[in-house]
Amino acid sequence: MPEFLEKLAQLRQVTAHPEVCNWNEIYSIYGALAPDVRKLNTPDTITDGIDPRRIEACWPEIRQIVRSVPSYEACLAAMRQAGCKTTIQEVGKDPDFVRVSFRFHPYMRRRLSLKRVSHMLELPADLF
């Protein structure tokens, strides 16, 4: 599992709130793809129907599901064994690009992911 998920699963409880998005910033990141991203997130977003209290109440089960995913080390070992590139440098991307991409990628698809839900959580600054 990615390091982000491992860190998230370590949180014993969370405080959730409705998702607040700076759509101007999000659309500016997507540039020419902004109209497509807008279509995926209007008139409502994938998180609009989620009650933050439900996330808090279900957090123990969410953690259990996250923990069922193979560890970061196991995934990394499998990728290396398969000959995959495993570092930002090997992929040839700028670290700033990767940081921005990790923050904004949940808006490019209309899928409820733990990364998208994480934008509804009050998280420690060092989690990322």
Give the ranges of each region predicted by the language model.
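C-terminal charged capping/lid subdomain of soluble metabolic enzymes
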Residues: E3-F128
